[in-house]
Structures are given as structure tokens and as C-alpha cells.
């Protein structure tokens, strides 16, 4: 039966734990050089409206490791930008492919792709959510903290798509979530209401030190995301006091881990000292995107 993952909430707590176990197994097998050609002769289409280093490379490597094939499709390669509807594109690609991932400007696009295709569809980033990133993040948290229940997850910066998925995912997994954003940049009310319905415990503040106090995890992201360039000067001013630096780490737990979905703007949202310091798990987190996505691909396409 076809299954799509467009939001982290499309997965239950039990399924997330199963995916993390599968991801850890796949990671160990890759490190040991074991063959994992579970998707031989299967193809994954990858639609990119927004470019990405980590997303493209990790999904392509995943399909190579599985003995399958990944096809990169940007907006110049497909006819959607020249009049063909998303619905027709989804139906057509369903005849060629075994799965589709899409990194899109509008969440509506990935929803239509899922609705009109007969193959599984994965949201690899939309303006609403980034579930693949959060699966990699959760794998990293499990590696370093060995649990989720009772942890405090502090988000410092823009209440964006990654923040939305982190908020909802934390509610599912039983972590306390604290968001520190400048006024006007908080997660939208619908995501807060959804987190509350999932039993989530969260706080919203405009003081990074309040969010980071006794935190087990401090997470940040760029202040100016792709598509927000017109607001760059305004955002840099308003986020100036939301930097993740040594002073902020001082109010967190001594063994706090620092995370960032990358790419980072060093010297803006995070200092070199913290990014390259002993509390940083940022590059382990980046690698875990590969393993977590492999587990998801396998669950949906096998």
C-alpha cells in the first residue's frame, strides 16, 4: 500500500523508533562495508525547486547503496514550469519510478504530487516542514543522549519549517521544546495547536537564555533562508542577539549538544568556537541525514 511522508506527524512514535533502529543498522553495515542492495532495479525521482548540497547527495548515495538509481530533476528538467500541471507530472512519473522525493517552495506542490501519484512521496523540504532533517536529528539525539523522554530541546532563531518539524517531532517523542525567536518570527499558531494536541510541552520566548536554560539540546538555523534574501538587512538586525555562542551555552547543561541543519553562516547564528567545539554534533548530524533517509526510503519503497 502506497505511503507518503509529508510531515513528521505522518509517522507514529513507534514508527520513528523503528526507523531510528533501521538507520543505526544501515549505518553500521555501511561502516563495515556490507552490501545493502535492497532496492536493486528501483528508481527514485528527486524534484528540486530549491537547491541543496546535503539533500541531493544523501538521497543519491542512499539509492546507490541500495543498488537502485536516483534521478535528479530540477525545474528546468521537467515541464511543470512550462505549463504541465503537477497532477499530470505526478501521474506520468508514477509510470516510470518507484518513489519520489520533492524539495519544493510550496507545501501545496508536494501534497499534489502525493495525491496524484501511485508511488510513495517524501517531503525533502517545503515551506511548512522538513521531516527528513528531523529524522536525522533524532538519530543524532539518540546516539548522544540515548533517549528522548524528559530532554529539553531549545530552538534559538527563526521559527521556520525546520522549527515546525522539530516542534511537532518533540511533542511526539516526549521532549520539552523551548523556542526563542524575535517577536514576529515565532512558529505559526496552527503548529503550536498541533503540538498541543499531540501532548507537547513547549514554551515561546524572545529571550535565548530563557530557552537555553538547562537545555540538553540547543539547535539553530540560518537567519536568512533561501527566499528571504529581500529581508536580509532587517533579519540580521532583528536576530543579532540570537547567536549561539559560548555565553549561551553557559546557561545550558554542561553536556548540552549543539545542532544545526546546515548550511551555517559562521559568525552570525553560530560562532566558530561553538560550531567546532566539544559540544557540537553538527557534522555527525549531517552524516545521519543519509542513514535516517535510507531507513525511510527502505520503509516506503521496499
From Swiss-Prot:
GO terms for cellular component: cytoplasm. Gene3D superfamilies: Aspartate/ornithine carbamoyltransferase (3.40.50.1370). GO terms for biological process: arginine biosynthetic process via ornithine; citrulline biosynthetic process; L-arginine biosynthetic process. Its main location: cytoplasm. It catalyses: carbamoyl phosphate + L-ornithine = L-citrulline + phosphate + H(+). GO terms for molecular function: amino acid binding; ornithine carbamoyltransferase activity. Carbamoyl phosphate binds at residues 52-55, 79, 103, 130-133, 261-262, 289. The keyword Transferase applies. Reversibly catalyzes the transfer of the carbamoyl group from carbamoyl phosphate (CP) to the N(epsilon) atom of ornithine (ORN) to produce L-citrulline. L-ornithine binds at residues 161, 221, 225-226. PANTHER family: ORNITHINE CARBAMOYLTRANSFERASE, MITOCHONDRIAL, ORNITHINE TRANSCARBAMYLASE, MITOCHONDRIAL. Pathway: Amino-acid biosynthesis; L-arginine biosynthesis; L-arginine from L-ornithine and carbamoyl phosphate: step 1/3. It is found in: Cytoplasm. Belongs to the aspartate/ornithine carbamoyltransferase superfamily. OTCase family. InterPro entries: Asp/Orn_carbamoyltranf_P-bd, Asp/Orn_carbamoylTrfase, Asp/Orn_carbamoylTrfase_sf, Asp_carbamoyltransf_Asp/Orn-bd, Orn/put_carbamltrans, OTCase_ArgI. It comes from Methanosarcina acetivorans (strain ATCC 35395 / DSM 2834 / JCM 12185 / C2A). Signal peptide: none annotated. This is Ornithine carbamoyltransferase. Keywords: Amino-acid biosynthesis, Arginine biosynthesis, Cytoplasm, Transferase. SUPFAM superfamilies: Aspartate/ornithine carbamoyltransferase. It is an enzyme of class 2 (transferase). HAMAP family: OTCase. Its EC number is 2.1.3.3.
